[in-house]
Amino acid sequence: MRVGIIGCSGRMGTLLSSLLRSSNRFTLGPGFSRQSPYSLDSVIESNDVLVDFSSSSFSEELLIALLSNPKPLIFATTKPEPSYSVDEKLQRLAAYVPVVVCPNTSLGAYVQKRLVGLLARVFDDRYDIRISEVHHREKKDPVSGTAKELASILCHTKQEAWQQEYSIGSRCHSVKNIELHVSRVGNISGEHEVAFISDKEHISIHHKVFSRAVFAEGALRILDWLIDESPPPGCYGPEVGLKVSM
């Protein structure tokens, strides 16, 4: 399988390129970045599958090109805000090829999301909720895709389990608030914590990445799944691509 990386000259693109070069299952094809000598259309044409590690500002352009020449896609980028246009194009592309939407390809990050969903069902509104995320100072996203996913899981679960409406930064009395704290400091690869805090106790689920290699390894795991399972067209989540059963 020939793999093309969108955002090939970035930190994640460079790490995944190194893993692919040492793999006996995959061939590293031409990648795309603003500095690469290849056009986006030629990169799509030359590869069997694409991994997007670029940026949210490029998502629309990439998906428009892919809709003209559909190829399987691992979408490992934070969606832009608002995301409805990108979501619509991802769904259209998924009618033709398998699309794995996984803004955070770390196995630990996926497990954290599942645990957060479980705790949101257990703890009622006597527990305040706080999401904290820390990344390196060069990260462009004002809020990480993982933090957005965690907030979405909390809001959905609270509505489903408790019939309570939650949102980030709510100042409305009828909508309960999820506090969000974002830091961009140093060279931190990624850190996310979700805390449930009452007057009497505090429980938190904390995931910290020590090396960005974990994201590249997660992407490789999803590529393995694409080869092993040959899934039909459709939109898949990280639990399928990362081969996790919980």
Curated annotation (Swiss-Prot):
Its main location: cytoplasm. Its EC number is 1.17.1.8. This is 4-hydroxy-tetrahydrodipicolinate reductase. It comes from Chlamydia abortus (strain DSM 27085 / S26/3) (Chlamydophila abortus). Pathway: Amino-acid biosynthesis; L-lysine biosynthesis via DAP pathway; (S)-tetrahydrodipicolinate from L-aspartate: step 4/4. The keyword Chaperone does not apply. NADP(+) binds at R34. Belongs to the DapB family. GO terms for cellular component: cytosol. It is an enzyme of class 1 (oxidoreductase). It catalyses: (S)-2,3,4,5-tetrahydrodipicolinate + NAD(+) + H2O = (2S,4S)-4-hydroxy-2,3,4,5-tetrahydrodipicolinate + NADH + H(+); (S)-2,3,4,5-tetrahydrodipicolinate + NADP(+) + H2O = (2S,4S)-4-hydroxy-2,3,4,5-tetrahydrodipicolinate + NADPH + H(+). HAMAP family: DapB. The active site is at H135, K139. The keyword Transit peptide does not apply. Keywords: Amino-acid biosynthesis, Cytoplasm, Diaminopimelate biosynthesis, Lysine biosynthesis, NAD, NADP, Oxidoreductase. Catalyzes the conversion of 4-hydroxy-tetrahydrodipicolinate (HTPA) to tetrahydrodipicolinate. NAD(+) binds at G7, C8, S9, G10, R11, M12, A76, T77, T78, C102, P103, N104, T105. One of its GO terms (biological process) is lysine biosynthetic process via diaminopimelate. (S)-2,3,4,5-tetrahydrodipicolinate binds at H136, G145, T146. Coiled coil: none annotated. GO terms for molecular function: 4-hydroxy-tetrahydrodipicolinate reductase; NAD binding; NADP binding; oxidoreductase activity, acting on CH or CH2 groups, NAD or NADP as acceptor. The lineage of its organism: Bacteria, Pseudomonadati, Chlamydiota, Chlamydiia, Chlamydiales. It is found in: Cytoplasm.
